[in-house]
Amino acid sequence: MSKAVLRFIRLSPTKARLIAREVQGMNAEEALAALEFMPNKAAKVISKVITSAVANGGYEPEEVVITSCRVDRGPYLKRFRPRARGRASRIMKPTSHVYVEVAQKKDS
């Protein structure tokens, strides 16, 4: 089993979790092929983390399964936007932590 972590990525955790749920339990090769055609920023980020997890274990993508793909909420970047009458509105820019674990397939 090998893992990869990407922390403090400027990505909404809510949007990233939608993609993470799709690939969990899939073969790594199939997951990377599916993520390649998804038009989301989260798909590109998660595919890089999966590739890293596979490389960390010294495996090939076709011989591993994604056992866990988790996205946690990171700290918010707080920004301010000027508004009328000298006021300001707070803009919250979310960050995420992406965790991926892969393990070798069990041949039955």
From Swiss-Prot:
This protein binds specifically to 23S rRNA; its binding is stimulated by other ribosomal proteins, e.g. L4, L17, and L20. It is important during the early stages of 50S assembly. It makes multiple contacts with different domains of the 23S rRNA in the assembled 50S subunit and ribosome. The globular domain of the protein is located near the polypeptide exit tunnel on the outside of the subunit, while an extended beta-hairpin is found that lines the wall of the exit tunnel in the center of the 70S ribosome. InterPro entries: Ribosomal_uL22 (IPR001063), Ribosomal_uL22_bac/chlpt-type (IPR005727), Ribosomal_uL22_bac/org-type (IPR047867), Ribosomal_uL22_CS (IPR018260), Ribosomal_uL22_sf (IPR036394). GO terms for cellular component: cytosolic large ribosomal subunit. The lineage of its organism: Bacteria, Pseudomonadati, Campylobacterota, Epsilonproteobacteria, Nautiliales. The gene is rplV. GO terms for biological process: translation. Part of the 50S ribosomal subunit. It comes from Nitratiruptor sp. (strain SB155-2). It holds the Pfam family Ribosomal_L22. Belongs to the universal ribosomal protein uL22 family. Keywords: Ribonucleoprotein, Ribosomal protein, RNA-binding, rRNA-binding. The keyword Protein biosynthesis does not apply. PANTHER family: CHLOROPLAST 50S RIBOSOMAL PROTEIN L22-RELATED, LARGE RIBOSOMAL SUBUNIT PROTEIN UL22M. One of its GO terms (molecular function) is rRNA binding. This is Large ribosomal subunit protein uL22.
